[in-house]
């Protein structure tokens, strides 16, 4: 080991002043060209390190730790240079004011990411990006540490900063990999749990510290740092569920979804009156038995990806790959999903590829330019939510969102994604006036980049995560949302039926006296019920912002409100389409949903609230047991009107048919007037069993009905040779089935 010197070749131990100056000012675009080991022009090598605030640096032999000599500090404080007679692996022994550190030199490692990884990323088709970019706990050349990689093609310099380097951007400037614009560095000996951000020098100067778009874990909000997370280490026990879920998600299978917000479903109250949210494991212990008791097949979680503002309910998120720290660690979330699967409950996540918030630590102007968003506000700013719109026409952003979807489906065994705000993605003029939007390349209003992305997403998910579902929240009449991409559709498995939801709620909110004038509002949904594969959604959006809770939408006095609610839920469960119900609706919570408070569980001491809960449980069990209620959802022949035109009495009657030709008869009386001896045609003669009566005493109804069984009469009605004479309870639905011998 010698002091720095000039070799006979003229190579300088100290780099050019312009390079040193750029390094000191943290503006050097290629720190690896200066720092680390470099040949001296002969048989030896120089070792350079820039360690601001270091008191001294010594070189140690990598193999046995023997001291090779002290590096000399140059005229520039913190810039150290040493010389080795022969190239050899070495360690840096750094003396700081607060202690000593021994580590490998981050600038002694060559390029990290493989060319194929970079190619697939640039192409927008990397299927496992969450194991490539971001902070990856890994081993390089036998050394444990963390590899950081971030996409910032227009940055002049990117550094990773954290408590491990005193948040000093001069300590770990990264290597730029041309031409993809990915910056990378390996920090030896760094451990999981370290917090970090990226310090980025843009074209116009230093930007606010940025969180990692590819972070696998984060700190607890309101903190905004990313957290180094080891690859998910969880022993899954859900293999039986995974093998069976393809059949469970088939259009002919029962699909009944309980939508919830993880933080406000149920909480623990401390003695001081403060509320504490449950973590994932605690929530599993309480939620799973409840969902199992009610008979739902799946739960749907409002977005659980990390989001800075809790009041956004998760829909304004910034970490597309990290579960929020509010409810525990990534392993805790995996344990929650695994517990659901072992209880035969599927897990669907709300997923938001449409837009993201403008927080300065997030994706906005990430490298000093509109990187993830459109540059033109007419394309890139969402006026309804004051958010930015993903530029899915950019291949890297396309691939980023595609990888996010696959990350949840594959790494966390998620069973389906509900894609939020699809309508806002499909139309360039969504919620915009004339002159406020940019036409596509053909002059139209369709967002061609989004259409391409959604089709690619659904094709890739079907290939990479078979048996999972992708469900669209799409509120317009866009054709073919759930049609295969090969047939020109978008390729979703299901689409939310927003039209049915709006029409049916409008009907139910009317005074029963006036329903006769709006009879077709309730029947209209059957005109287009088979145009898509539909989910009937009563979601969180319908019980907030002054819309009233589901039961409080219903007209009448207290008894009538409950009767209307029971009738509505029974109508929903017997209507073609899969089911989704938001938490609290299943027992008739009076309050609108508030994300800061738990549901009003105290209401379960009242019989009428318990009655609604009992009804939902029985509807789910009937829905799963009776093939006629789910098997032919996508087949118009599985539904048959008997009475759709009795406006005067506001009575509806229809049949649901199974593949085996077994019928169920549904009769609904949507007025508070009992209809005695009301005749309904029957396709099968003999005794019919009353499977469910929403007015039954067990549901806190008046208990009017038909004694559990009724026989047909040989009097033709409604195109049938036989008929049933039924007593129709007030504001109630009956479900009947032919009695088997």
From Swiss-Prot:
It catalyses: Transfers a segment of a (1->4)-alpha-D-glucan chain to a primary hydroxy group in a similar glucan chain. One of its GO terms (molecular function) is hydrolase activity, hydrolyzing O-glycosyl compounds. Monomer. The keyword DNA-binding does not apply. This is 1,4-alpha-glucan branching enzyme GlgB. It is an enzyme of class 2 (transferase). Keywords: Carbohydrate metabolism, Glycogen biosynthesis, Glycogen metabolism, Glycosyltransferase, Transferase. Pathway: Glycan biosynthesis; glycogen biosynthesis. The lineage of its organism: Bacteria, Pseudomonadati, Pseudomonadota, Gammaproteobacteria, Pseudomonadales. GO terms for biological process: glycogen biosynthetic process. GO terms for cellular component: cytosol. The active site is at residues 420, 473. InterPro entries: A-amylase/branching_C, Branching_enzy, GlgB, GlgB_N, GlgB_N_E_set_prok, Glyco_hydro_13_cat_dom, Glyco_hydro_13_N, Glyco_hydro_b. It comes from the Bacteria. Its EC number is 2.4.1.18. The keyword Glycosyltransferase applies. Belongs to the glycosyl hydrolase 13 family. GlgB subfamily. Catalyzes the formation of the alpha-1,6-glucosidic linkages in glycogen by scission of a 1,4-alpha-linked oligosaccharide from growing alpha-1,4-glucan chains and the subsequent attachment of the oligosaccharide to the alpha-1,6 position.
